[in-house]
């Protein structure tokens, strides 16, 4: 299974929702909390080109934010992306 990285910040309801969905699906993830990791913002911009939260990266693929995660979960792509 590919590594899932979730870029978050404090006081972010959409970040909490994304992490909760991953937990419900039994998907392990690494969290990069940019409120605690000031260098993480540059890494986020480099990896994804985005600076909004959350950002979900699966392996080297930037999935996107919460809406993208929900859509991938609904249409079955999430499992495919994890297995690829």
Where on the chain are the PLM-derived regions?
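Generic alpha-helical hydrophobic packing signal
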Residues: 18, 27-32, 73, 79-82
């Amino acid at each position: 299974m590919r590594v899932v990285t979730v870029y978050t910040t404090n006081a972010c309801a959409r970040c909490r929702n994304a992490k909760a969905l991953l937990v419900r699906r039994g998907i392990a993830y690494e969290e990069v909390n940019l409120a605690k990791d000031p260098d993480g913002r540059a890494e986020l911009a480099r990896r994804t080109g985005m600076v909004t939260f959350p950002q979900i990266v699966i392996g080297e693929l930037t999935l996107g934010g919460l809406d993208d995660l929900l859509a991938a979960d609904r249409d079955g792509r999430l499992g495919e992306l994890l297995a690829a």
